[in-house]
Amino acid sequence: MFLNRGKSKKNLGAIALAGMVISSMIGGGIFSLPQNMAASAGAGAIILAWLLTGIGMFFIANTFKILSLVRPDLTTGIYMYSREGFGPYVGFTIGWGYWLCQIFGNVGYAVMTMDALNYFFPPYFKGGNTIPAIIGGSILIWVFNFIVLKGIRQASFINIIGTVCKLVPLIVFIIITAFAFKLAIFKTDFWGDAVTKTQPALGSVTSQLKSTMLVTLWAFIGIEGAVVMSARAKSPSAVGKATLLGFVGCLTVYILLSILPFGSLFQYQLAGIPNPSTAGVLGMLVGRWGEILMNVGLLIAILSSWLSWTIIVAEIPYTAATNGTFPEIFAIENAQHSPKLSLYITSALMQITMLFVYFSTNAWNTMLSITGVMVLPAYLASAAFLFQFSKNKKYPNKGPVKSYIAKYTGFFAVIYSLWLIYAGGLNYLLMSVILLALGIPFYIDAGKKSKREKTFFAKKEVTKIIIIALLALLAIFLFSTEKIRL
């Protein structure tokens, strides 16, 4: 066990990193995509929603690719881009918020895993918050902890296997629905404006788009996976390749999974299928074996994503600690170059959170929504940094990407990131500010122990701390007086 000062073992290639990106994006939610998308939209609106989301996310994905090439010195980008562009406190806050977000997200995977097991062993794991479910989820938290402790490279190899295994059922689903596809059914009520005795119209295309894009917005959380692990990448180009490969691959799967079922089932039928709806669709098309296959795929998908996020979630505080922004204890590695203390602390917090799930499912669902919003400022800060850096004289114009391309990529990524934050909801954003403010004492502690204490507590950094603290107090007031509710 030793304290790392920024020399992580660089042994992850483009395939391993792409596996990280795909696995972190494709979790259990994809197996419910047909119903989620059809619930309030016709096929036409769904195609438009994916087109618009794909364009927006392309700019974010390309932001990460460009930054990995023009600033390869800034490893673990989500945190480092924010710190480099906007100072130590913004960097800390982005890292802190991202870390909390993924801690709660990983506990969400524990809940989903146990709930998925309930299909095979009812009713012991129903809802994912029974006593057997809490015990099972807790065991898995520590199993993944020890897998990652054995080494990031080994864990990444297991993750690649898991990614392939969860893609197989999805590919089978796509093939079956493609063969069952009938153009006449697909064209029926393409824009969702038909009215029947039992089925009202779905509304305007605009309203369908709005409701559907709330689903597509969250489908790409995890696209930053390769960037977060860039300190362990074999080369900067591997990070960029993995990010774009993961983006294109996932977008293709999402579109096919959402659209092809409309060629064999009508919108109202898809909207009424219980989740995971991929199992329900195959159950209707091929029978029981298809339903079982998709439920097994769901379980593998959740476990694989959970492993990816276990690797990622410990990397942020670890990297922040290596340059003094997080408390030094997070920088301790083991002999396999895994962030030992960061993993243990993260897993311990996940374990504590897991216990709370047993007592309050509704509060837990609310917390997941809040922490989902907390990842979005990381995208905004990265995009803003690219836009800012593209206009800097230090930008390598003779490098792999021209400055004007970087500038427009950053600009449109900023616009789309702001849209994501707006769509997340003001109430959740304000609650997330309260959670961000909880990190202030840890920032102060790290700053006092840093060799760059003056930088940590420069006037502009103190001003930022005061602004976050005041916003948190305002949020507490608004929630306590019920002027804003979750």
Curated annotation (Swiss-Prot):
GO biological process: amino acid transport
Lineage, uppermost ranks: Bacteria, Pseudomonadati, Chlamydiota, Chlamydiia, Chlamydiales
Family the entry assigns: Belongs to the amino acid-polyamine-organocation (APC) superfamily. Basic amino acid/polyamine antiporter (APA) (TC 2.A.3.2) family.
A Pfam family: AA_permease_2
Cellular compartment(s): Cell inner membrane
Residues making up the signal peptide according to the UniProt record: none
Gene3D superfamilies the UniProt entry points to: Amino acid/polyamine transporter I
Any GO molecular function: antiporter activity
Function in brief: Catalyzes the exchange of L-arginine for agmatine. The arginine uptake by the bacterium in the macrophage may be a virulence factor against the host innate immune response.
Transmembrane segments: 12-32, 41-61, 85-105, 129-149, 160-180, 211-231, 242-262, 296-316, 341-361, 367-387, 418-438, 461-481
Organism for this UniProt entry: Chlamydia caviae (strain ATCC VR-813 / DSM 19441 / 03DC25 / GPIC) (Chlamydophila caviae)
Topology in membrane: Multi-pass membrane protein
Name of the protein in its database record: Arginine/agmatine antiporter
InterPro entries attached to this UniProt entry: AA/rel_permease1, Amino_acid_antiprt, APC_superfamily
Keywords (A to Z) from UniProt: Amino-acid transport, Antiport, Cell inner membrane, Cell membrane, Membrane, Transmembrane, Transmembrane helix, Transport, Virulence
Listed GO CC annotations: plasma membrane
